[in-house]
A protein has these predicted regions:
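Short, well-ordered alpha-helical microsegments
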Residues: 23, 47-48, 98-100
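Glycine-rich, proline-tolerant flexible connector loops at the mouths of alpha/beta enzymes
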Residues: 38-47
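Short beta-strand/loop segments at the ligand-binding rim of alpha/beta enzyme cores
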Residues: 8-10, 55-66, 109-114
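N-terminal amphipathic alpha-helix/helix-capping segment at the start of soluble metabolic enzymes
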Residues: 1-26
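Conserved anion-binding
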Residues: 7-8, 70-158
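Conserved, mostly hydrophobic/aromatic
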Residues: 13, 37, 67, 90, ...
Length: 158
């Protein structure tokens, strides 16, 4: 007889679905086999925060993949709001002001901040169009160095 094996809580299942009912159905189907879930922008406006709270009440880990990118004061306050939800992970864009503000906003909570270095959809040509004179690889490496200096917990780099 096979023993029930719990998943590695460091692995997050992306709930990139169009509505919370579909996400709830998937969570129910997976039961205790998955301990950690990512909720992104697609679900944000249709109940993603509330879904995250339901999952936390079930003992699950929550990763809000919201990629904050705003002025420092706004990112700091928004990060503080995410902390009040007892989230485990949050993404922000890897601009120094954004990263520093998110680190400041988390205060003494256990929230881990991940910095998104460069969106995967940006190639050399699209980066040039928005004013960057580096290719994606160079920009990723530069932003990783900045992320380390700013005190975030990890990076999302591809």
């Amino acid at each position: 007889m096979l023993e029930k094996k719990m998943s590695d809580e460091r692995l997050y299942l992306a709930l990139d679905l169009p509505d919370v009912d579909e996400a709830r159905g998937l969570v129910k189907l997976l039961g205790d086999h998955i301990e950690s879930y990512k909720i992104g922008l697609q679900l944000l406006a249709v109940g993603g925060v509330e879904l995250g709270q339901e999952l936390k009440a079930m003992g699950k880990n929550i990763f809000y993949d919201y990629k904050f990118h705003d002025i420092g004061a706004t990112v700091e306050k928004a990060t503080r709001s995410i902390c009040s939800l007892d989230a485990n992970l949050l993404t922000v864009h890897a601009r120094p002001e954004v990263m520093k503000s998110a680190v400041l906003g988390r205060e003494s909570s256990d929230l881990k901040i991940l910095a998104v270095t460069v969106l995967t959809s940006l190639n050399k040509k699209s980066l040039e169009k928005i004013g960057y004179h580096q290719n994606a690889e160079e920009l990723v490496l530069r932003r990783v160095d900045q992320a380390l200096e700013c005190g975030v917990d990890g990076v999302v780099a591809s």
